[in-house]
Amino acid sequence: MSVQAYTNTPNLPNLIHSESITNSPVFIPNLRSKSDNKHRLNTSEELPFTKKRRATKHFLKMEVSAKISEPPSSKSVEFGRHLNMRHDFSELLEQPLTTSKTRVFKSFNEKLKGKPQLVKSDKGVLPLNKQSDILNSYERVLSNASVDSALDKKAEVDIIPFDKSVMEPKNITFNDKSGLTKFGNSNSYETTYSDSSNYHTSTDSSQYNDQDDHVYDDTNDGTDDDINNNEYKDDESSSGSESYERDEDVDEEEEEDDDENNDEGDDEDENENDELRSENGSPNPSAAVINEQENMNMSGIEEYDETNLLNELGRIRRGNQFQSLASSILSSGNLENSDDEDVSLGPQTYRFNSSFHPFRSAFSAPGVQFGRLLEGIKDFSDPTVQMLSLQELSEAFAMSTEDMLVGLFSTDSYIAAFSEILSGRNYDFGEVSIQLMLSCTTCVSNMMEALPLCMAKIAYSPIVRILCERMFDMQYIDIAEQALGVLERLSKDFGICILEHRGMLAALQYFDFFYTTVQRTAISLAANCCKFLDESNASAAEEIIPLLSNILQSSDTIVVSKAYSCLETIIESLKTSPNIIETIISEDLITTIVNALTNSTSQNKSMHLQVQLLHIISSLCQSSSALILPFLNHNLPDVMYEMLCGIPPSDTSHQADMITMQSLYYCPIELIENLLRAITSLLPKNTSNLSDEFNTKLYRLNSILLTVVMDIYFIVPLHDIRSLAVTTALKMLCSIRENNLDGLVCSLPLSSFIASILNSRKSDNFLKRDALEMCLFLLEALPNVYSSLFIREGVVQEVGFLVRSTNADMKKIKLSISFSQNKSAARHEELKNLSTLKSLAKEFLSNYKEENLENSTLVQLKQLSKHLLSETKQDESFSELAKIFQEGSNITSHELLHSGLIHNLLLSLKKFGSSSLRTFLLAMNTCDEREVLEFGNGPLVSLIFCLQNLLSTVENFQLSTLPPDTENAVDHVFSRQFKLRLMALPGSRIRPPFRSLVVSINGLATIRTLDNYLHSRISVRNETGRRFSILREAGSLRESMSGSSRNSSGDYTDSMSQDAPNHTTEPSERRDSSTSSHFEEHFVFSLMGKKVPRNKTIFRILYEYIQLSDDHTLDDFWKTPVPIFYGEPDCIHNDMKGELNYENETEGFSINIREILDLLSILYYGIRDVHTLFPDKHFRGNIENILTDFSNWKLSAKLNRQLEEQQLVVHGCLPSWCISLTSAYPFLVPFETRYLLLQSTAFGLSRSVSFLLSRNPELSKNESSSILQFVSLHRQKIRISRKKIFNYALHLLATYAASENILEIEYEDEVGSGLGPTLEFYTSVSKEFTLNSLDIWRNDQPNSKFVYQASGLFPSPIPLLGSSPENERKISLFFALGQFVARSIYDSRIISIQFNPLFFARNIPLTISSVAKVDKGLANSLRYLEKLIPGKNPTNAETDIKLEDLHLDFTLPGFPSIELIPDGASTPVTTFNVSDYLNYVIDYTVGKGVQQQLEAFQNGFSSVFPYTSLQVLTEHELVTLFGTVDEDWSYATLMKSIVADHGYTMESPTIQRLLTLMSQMNFQEQRDFLQFITGSRKLPIGGFAGLNPPLTVVRRLNEPPYVPDDYLPSVMTCVNYLKLPEYSSSEVLGSRLSKAILEGQGSFHLS
């Protein structure tokens, strides 16, 4: 191995790439001449070092390149290129030289595999059995050199793997070819080797003749290196290292200071060095005889001379092994001193400023002078010399930095030479000339990298023109590719130079011939050059537009994105020149843009591309109105509609349009904003001279998008976008031709839209101004329509109120200005805006007179509403109301709200109960047949529609968002730490160090976590002497203290974070109470004088604090601490009893809104239960279609938009209306949205975060994401026995029901585990709960094993008279059932229990109708008995049937053991007590007889998570969720949902046979198949499409001699995997699958 140690010598070329430069302090040796032996360098005063170090450690910087050679033998005397290694000496930047020796030789020893080593140096052959010998050898070289020679010295050391069998002891010569001063006239060493591992060396002579005495002082080595009288001494009895005679003038105190300033890395290296010394013993340097006749032949080591040095370093660089030299050169850069101080180094003085660099003089060394290289480059007579010079110069540039090269040479002559070579004028094109051009281009590229300042000279030199010509010629693609790289670098700052030589065209004309990476370079060059376009060079853009059109068809998304960036930049640069834009933009390009936008919508491509395309369209249309029509001709409005709504536009009913509006909330805000701007750009400024074709297209645009723009106003909460929507709507109206206006706007709720803007509290003056301008336009265009409509919609009344409020505001501002000395321009501007608004309002009101404000419809509705409260006039009033709301009714929201109709109708329906509802529904019946009910397209639907419009108009539910200045990235918000200043409450007994404590805590942590943290830090003694327990929850908190140091304000600062907090919203309170026994007392916390709940997260507390205070934003708490007081509970004052709570249950629920919602609720449940209200009538039509009309699309969109604020959802910061509205009126919002709300909010923090990650997979991909540490969901594996599965299930529920872990089930003696066995467990236990033997359900088939009830499972009543163990058993089973059902939702498991909807009803009315929902036969009997009550039914008064003949007693029908009253079995039912009998039966059936069971179920459910969370779902939806099966097994659905893989495709015959077989299965076969495949007997929500992972069918291979028909299919239930052999026929497939299902049930084994 050849080791070359390069010092900071002028002879060494500085060949370092600029990217490897780092800022580090440097090392300078203690170089002292003999005449200045006692003077040291004062580094602390004269050099800008980062640490105070001795000068002996700050200048010497070495790089070792090692080449391992094999030992010489008779067969191979010289080999040496097996391994090139360069050790990284960058650690020398921070440690003294000798400390780093151990690291160097560790690497050497690993390569040499521990063989005995010899060192061949300038002193001869030495045994290397000590780690530091090699460095000591060249230390001695430096120690005997003068200052000048030390700076110019290249020391060479050879390490020879020693093999005793082939290597004879002999004298080895060393020829010092460095051209430096010789060290002594003769140096003879006699070396002997023994068989032992230790080498013994005797010294014959060690006399050195040198005039200068230099001492290398290593203060960190811990040993003394002595050189006395220039004599080398071998002292075997020394303490383990060579010793030099120390200078007697060395200051001991200075050495101590030096040691104290060493960093930890030095100590580590010293320890490491000490360990190696102890292993190897003390160094035993040997002597060698220097014989100048034999030079290095024995070791086979290649010598380095100055001519091949650059090439060798280049090879090392290409091996990526030059970082240490880079660090070395960088460290030299730190020697610059802004004050240009002189530093004394012995007898010479060096100036450490920008003009000095320790390596710069290397370039003037013999053999590598830049002048010589320039001469070689200009030598056109010898291409070889040119090639070598270019390569050498290129390597020099590649390994250099700007600091190393500045000032060494002039770049002008080199640029001229490069231009001459690239021009090719001096030689014919051939292989040599091509290689010269390639090398020259590489040299130019490296030169720009090393010297960025030369780029300007290159840009304005002939090089750019020549390179562009080379790309135009395209004779040699290699030259073109390199030219592209050079020009791309130049294009960022000097694109104008490339444009002058048509560089963009040159880069793109042969685009298809390049590789993808080169294509990206070419398009990047064009994109950069486009930024320099203007009218003067617009021809360059015109040249490349056709090429860009082709490039836009590329399959590389990066290339396409860059191409659109080119186009976007071109348009922006030339947008003030519409003539040029119209010239360069072709019809084909417009087609390409629209098609790209269409494809991006249908293929769900990146939103960035969509925004980019929309911006291009906006810029083009704004620049030239002539381009609008071509875009409209390509159906751009249809594409925009699909981008907003998710589906293409249709010309169907307005109801269908409203349903599509629900998709608006899926559209990102950024995309909505750009779509609005694009729509605005498509509206021409001057519409007076438009052609008929243009007007037709504009009409199509407005008819499709105007209603969407109006809906955006209601859906998007951001004010800027709402304002943009109103402005866009106004411009759209103004663009419509008057003769077309009537047909368009009459079908749109424009008047109510305007009324909403004027009535909104959130509307500013600019929004109201646009609304007034819209009013004036409509009045002028369609006075006959809107003059009366504005009265009926209440617009006139709102404008009148606006005038009065504006007058009051103007008076306040004028008064403020008159009393204020500061005449604020803003106040004057505000006054001006109000004046404008007032003028528009007065202009509008001038069209109306007081006597013309009468509203006949409103008067009629007021009279009708008065009659609704009279029971005698109900029939007449309801009939008249039905006539008013007949199809086509035009009652406005304003009329409906102010007539009192809603209020009186609601009172009437509530006051007279179900009889009034029956009368109302009969009046709304549109069918003339007596026994038939029909409501479709009748007055009832019209009433519902009017109520929904009114609700959308008057509702004012506000959306919560993060503050605009808050970074809204999900992971960013979760990863940030909040600062809290915890201050002790007055009177607290907390010790002084903790009375003011600043902590940094994640927002996901709770106050309970903070409490536990403080208990672990603070010990407080209360009045009785009890101490707070010092608890540490393992893994719950990780404290990273900053030394518990005080800050400037005297506070202690801690940092807190959670590893795995176990927190949920409601369950946490139960766990908190269960663990509170461990605490003697909890701390209490207060903010703003209010107690802070322990279960709330820090983020939620601070967010509520922001809502209550207008002086702070969320970002403030990331910068400055928020004060929170804490202390013992007895420190809380009487005025601090209330809790900090921003929730307002009545927020947004005005009296009008509440009445509208209540009326809708009565109508909804009345229609849903119409069969119960009218058991003797037949309903015609689909009830579900009417029930969907109760869904309010605006509120649905609002809630979905709110749920997109995932940070607020996770922290429980949703507005209160989200839960209260969906709980009280679930019919307003679709099931999918409410179920999403349930999953996001009901299961606690950990589940909420986990659900967030499932919806945002990109967050969980990064394992270092801080959000992952808060997902403490572990899997609890439980092994049970199948034989007693129900008993095991009950025990499991009693033990683990409230566990936050995910429960997974395994079975004894079975290998299966995971999802499959777990799902089967839930399916099996579901079935066990329906066993007839449990006797807990009503049952229509008492002799069957399992309960069957046609109407669904409902509890059988239990006796109320007395208590018994049997009752307790049943109640406990319902408690366990509640736990089981809750656990299935909590862990997202599928169960199959067919409940009765009444089981989940919130309030069960004690009526025969309720009994009918449970037992129709019993309800019919009760109705019959009801007719026998005297006076109840006059038509049957004279019947011959007597109750006494029925022989009824006071026992519950169907349950003779249950007595309704004491001694009820012997008490007959008579006409006198039949009414009591009916009441008792109803109460026992659906009332008190089942109350305890239902309460037990709810309590068991709440032990997992709150049962009240289910209120967002209706009872029918819960029945569907837990048991009702309504699945789509059609062939088409299966084709869309099933995945074929690993040997199959969807076209494979076996797959086709399987799908056909599945689509033909009956109900029982479907259940068995699902349980075989998934472990569950029913599909999840969404059917087959809801399976996750999807059902996948793969091919099962056969092993000869067996054939596929010999195998049964097998499954992997955990991943829904079906391994299906390729059966020969459908019959074989069906039989084999049936057999597998039959034999595979009830076990999980390996297939």
Swiss-Prot record:
<dbReference type="Pfam" id="PF00632">
    <property type="entry name" value="HECT"/>
</dbReference>
<feature type="compositionally biased region" description="Polar residues">
    <location>
        <begin position="192"/>
        <end position="209"/>
    </location>
</feature>
<keyword id="KW-0808">Transferase</keyword>
<feature type="region of interest" description="K-box">
    <location>
        <begin position="1183"/>
        <end position="1257"/>
    </location>
</feature>
<dbReference type="GO" id="GO:0016607">
    <property type="term" value="C:nuclear speck"/>
</dbReference>
<dbReference type="InterPro" id="IPR011989">
    <property type="entry name" value="ARM-like"/>
</dbReference>
<comment type="function">
    <text>E3 ubiquitin-protein ligase which accepts ubiquitin from an E2 ubiquitin-conjugating enzyme in the form of a thioester and then directly transfers the ubiquitin to targeted substrates.</text>
</comment>
<dbReference type="InterPro" id="IPR016024">
    <property type="entry name" value="ARM-type_fold"/>
</dbReference>
<dbReference type="InterPro" id="IPR000569">
    <property type="entry name" value="HECT_dom"/>
</dbReference>
<feature type="domain" description="HECT">
    <location>
        <begin position="1294"/>
        <end position="1647"/>
    </location>
</feature>
<feature type="compositionally biased region" description="Polar residues">
    <location>
        <begin position="1051"/>
        <end position="1065"/>
    </location>
</feature>
<feature type="compositionally biased region" description="Low complexity">
    <location>
        <begin position="1039"/>
        <end position="1050"/>
    </location>
</feature>
<dbReference type="GO" id="GO:0000209">
    <property type="term" value="P:protein polyubiquitination"/>
</dbReference>
<dbReference type="GO" id="GO:0005634">
    <property type="term" value="C:nucleus"/>
</dbReference>
<feature type="active site" description="Glycyl thioester intermediate">
    <location>
        <position position="1614"/>
    </location>
</feature>
<feature type="compositionally biased region" description="Acidic residues">
    <location>
        <begin position="218"/>
        <end position="228"/>
    </location>
</feature>
<feature type="compositionally biased region" description="Basic and acidic residues">
    <location>
        <begin position="1066"/>
        <end position="1076"/>
    </location>
</feature>
<feature type="compositionally biased region" description="Acidic residues">
    <location>
        <begin position="245"/>
        <end position="273"/>
    </location>
</feature>
<keyword id="KW-0833">Ubl conjugation pathway</keyword>
<protein>
    <recommendedName>
        <fullName>Probable ubiquitin fusion degradation protein C12B10.01c</fullName>
        <ecNumber>2.3.2.26</ecNumber>
    </recommendedName>
</protein>
<dbReference type="InterPro" id="IPR045322">
    <property type="entry name" value="HECTD1/TRIP12-like"/>
</dbReference>
<dbReference type="InterPro" id="IPR035983">
    <property type="entry name" value="Hect_E3_ubiquitin_ligase"/>
</dbReference>
<dbReference type="GO" id="GO:0061630">
    <property type="term" value="F:ubiquitin protein ligase activity"/>
</dbReference>
<dbReference type="GO" id="GO:0043161">
    <property type="term" value="P:proteasome-mediated ubiquitin-dependent protein catabolic process"/>
</dbReference>
<feature type="region of interest" description="Disordered">
    <location>
        <begin position="1039"/>
        <end position="1076"/>
    </location>
</feature>
<comment type="similarity">
    <text>Belongs to the UPL family. K-HECT subfamily.</text>
</comment>
<dbReference type="GO" id="GO:0005741">
    <property type="term" value="C:mitochondrial outer membrane"/>
</dbReference>
<feature type="region of interest" description="Disordered">
    <location>
        <begin position="192"/>
        <end position="288"/>
    </location>
</feature>
<dbReference type="GO" id="GO:0005829">
    <property type="term" value="C:cytosol"/>
</dbReference>
